[in-house]
């Protein structure tokens, strides 16, 4: 599909070098084909024609991220946000880019600001919590996941995050409880196998008959 669309958009550009829709469509096609360098090259030509559209700069940033160059992505994601401060996805991607260049403090600042100004934007909670887990800060990660499920009790990934955080904190009863909550919501997901196996491991290791601890369901 996208290979065919590349030819269509190239023909459109040949007929009109100022046709922004054709450049954008070509760039998006290249992106889905994972030809990120071609996508970036096309988008850079596009912003020379029209530098007022935040989506164009956003896509450049995303392509740089996908191509393994978060340091280059930052500049274009910032430009997208300056054009449109309501572009929440650009802010998320900017936070990811900062994390990837070892600027965790800036990444956390962006997530915190997003949560403060857009409390219903659940992706900010999840990404922040996942980042905190990656940093080994499991207590703060669990707190952030709890904020998320307070907003949306059906956000199943948050229950898995809480379970894994408690697991790392050696709060095994709580870990089992939240693994089970996750399984109630998503018993057939890819992570369900891990969750079931981990519950069984924890029960056998810490809550067996030989152990003085008991598990309360």
Residue map of PLM features:
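Short acidic/polar micro-motifs centered on Gly/Asp/Asn
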Residues: 13, 95-99, 163-167
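Short solvent-exposed coil/turn linkers within tandem alpha-helical repeat scaffolds
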Residues: 16, 118-121, 155, 185-192
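Helix-start (N-cap) detector for alpha-helical repeat units in TPR-like alpha-solenoids
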Residues: 20-21, 54-55, 88-89, 122-123, ...
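Canonical tetratricopeptide repeat
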Residues: 25, 32, 59, 93, ...
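Terminal, low-structured helical/coil segments at or just beyond the last alpha-helical repeat
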Residues: 168, 176-217
């Amino acid at each position: 599909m996208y290979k065919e669309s590349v030819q269509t958009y190239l023909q459109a550009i040949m007929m009109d070098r100022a046709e922004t829709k054709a450049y954008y469509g070509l760039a998006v096609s290249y992106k889905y084909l994972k030809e990120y360098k071609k996508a970036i090259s096309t988008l850079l030509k596009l912003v020379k024609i029209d530098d007022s559209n935040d989506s164009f700069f956003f896509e450049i940033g995303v392509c740089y991220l996908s191509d393994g160059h978060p340091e280059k992505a930052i500049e274009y994601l910032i430009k997208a946000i300056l054009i449109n401060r309501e572009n929440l996805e650009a802010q998320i991607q900017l936070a990811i880019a900062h994390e990837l260049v070892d600027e965790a403090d800036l990444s956390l600042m962006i997530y915190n600001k997003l949560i403060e100004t857009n409390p219903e934007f659940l992706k900010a909670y999840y990404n922040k919590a996942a980042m905190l887990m990656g940093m080994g800060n499991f207590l703060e990660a669990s707190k952030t996941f709890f904020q998320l499920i307070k907003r949306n009790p059906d956000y199943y990934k948050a229950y898995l995050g809480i379970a894994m955080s408690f697991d790392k904190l050696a709060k095994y009863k709580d870990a089992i409880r939240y693994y089970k909550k996750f399984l109630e919501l998503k018993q057939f997901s890819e992570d369900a196998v891990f969750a079931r196996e981990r519950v069984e491991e924890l029960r056998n290791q810490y809550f067996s008959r030989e152990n003085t601890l008991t598990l309360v369901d």
